[in-house]
Structure formats: C-alpha cells, structure tokens
Amino acid sequence: MKRFICTVTVLLALCVPIHAEDSGLSMDEAMDIILEHHGVETEIDVSGYLTLDAEAMTREAAVAAVIRSYGIYPADEADYVWADEGAQGEQYRPYIDYAQRMGITDGVGGNRFAPTRPVTAWELRAMLDRAEGIQPEYPLAYDSPLCRLLSAETQRGLSLIHDFLVDKFYQEGRVIHATGTPIILPNGSSLSDQYVGWIQYEGDVWISVEVGNAPYWYQYEAAIHELGHYLGYRTALLDRNRVPEERDWLIRRYRPYCNENNHEFFADSFVAYILWPAELQENAPTVYAHIEACLHEMEGRM
C-alpha cells in the first residue's frame, strides 16, 4: 500500500497558554471554522464529508477533518480506515496517531487528548494552525475550492495502487487536478457532465470532487481508472473482443462502460484488478494475467 506519511518534520510545538474552556462545537460550526481557515466560500453542506452521526464535533472527528482539509491521507493501510464505517474509533485512529506524531494535537485537552470529548473553537483553530505547511507525499493541484476537503478520497485510490506506478506517474512531472463538473481542460474545452475523470495521455489527470454541487464519493475509483489508462497507454492494451466471456463478466461485475473501447476496457479492468483481484483472477484470468504482465513491464522500467 502507498504510505501517505508526511516526511516534513515539525520543529517545536508552540507553547500553549491555558485557556478557559469554551463550549464544544457543533459539526456545522466546526466545518465553518475549517472552511474559513482555508478561505473557502461554498453553499454546499460540508458536514456530510465525514462519517459522523453525532451533532457535536468530537476531538477525534475534528482531527480527521483538519488532516483531510490539508489533503493528507495518513493511514498505512487504506482498509484499516475504511473497512467498517460503524467502528468510528478505528476509523479515526490513524488520523490521531498521525496528528500526535506531527505535534498537531499538542496541548489539546491539556495533553490528555480524550478523543470523544467535544472539540472547542480554540482547540480546532490551534490544530489547523499547527497543520499549516504539512503537505501530502504526492501533491494535488487544488483547482476546486472544495478539493482540500475531498482529496483524501483521491489519495485513498492512489494508496491502493502499486507504489512504483504512482511514483512513475509523478516522476514524469504529471499532476492530478481536483476539479468539479463539467471538467474544463487547459485549452478551454468543457467535457460532458458524464466524465468524472480525464487523462491526457502525455499529460495530467483531472478528477471531479463534486458532481451537481454535491460531493463525488467515488474519487478513489476515478483515480484508479485514470492510472489504469496511464498503465495501458505506457504498455499494451488488450482487445476486449478476444475475451468476450471475460468482458461480459466485467460488464456484469462493474459496468457496461468497459465495453466502450479497448482503452476503457483496460482502465476498468485495472479497477477490478485493484479492488477485486481474486474475483478478476477467477472470472477473467486472461485479463488478470495481461495486467500483471503490464505491471511487471512498467516496474522493469523504473
């Protein structure tokens, strides 16, 4: 798994004066502070970006929101965070561990973090200030005012892809642009709203973080799909008509769009390879072996 652990070393934590306890924040109040900190103005209700049921914003939820707002995905294993939405304490643990390592939570709760306690405005602003300057290992181009809150989803997808493939993409000077719909390319052309991701084969990638003024929850799939295009273009496509039974299985398992052309067939097959490898190997062995060969070829070029 790709480790999105920041390599920047925080110097010394600022001395924290003792403040009178102010009341805990609601989720909406906390998200307003985060948006204000980043200079974001939006009509969209951003409280739904986190998996939260409680009206009050806890310290652990605030830590996750702060770190996501800087486009940082701290977990060593993506499944550790996303496997069970019901186990919120487990979801937050990688964010808390990361924040404590980087000094972001120093002084919050008098150094007794107490993750389920409500977060105060002072604590939230202190954590936002301490996180300033920490960058994800792989930078995103922030074209959308909301992408700082949503880019963790894109990084979730990248974290599942082989390290060498992501490394190669960035070593070529490419960038992943977070944007909205419709996607507008550098030449000014506007894509159809059906496109939530786009790649210039000799250039960058664009991924929508919002669709119809609402968060786009499948950025991770779009990231995998576009990196699949990159792999297929750099190696060799597979003629989908040569493997009709395997193609039909992928249509049923994933979506009919994979039959659009051989480029889309490869990219969607790569999504299946990353997300459901055992199923792909069992039901589409030729496709599985082809992607394996392409990955080995790409790795050999590193």
Please report, for each region that a protein language model flagged, where it lies by residue:
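Feature responds to low-complexity, polar/acidic, surface-exposed segments characteristic
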Residues: 18-94, 102-121, 130-141
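A short alpha-helix/helix-coil micro-patch that ends at or immediately precedes a cysteine
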Residues: 34-38, 70, 157-169
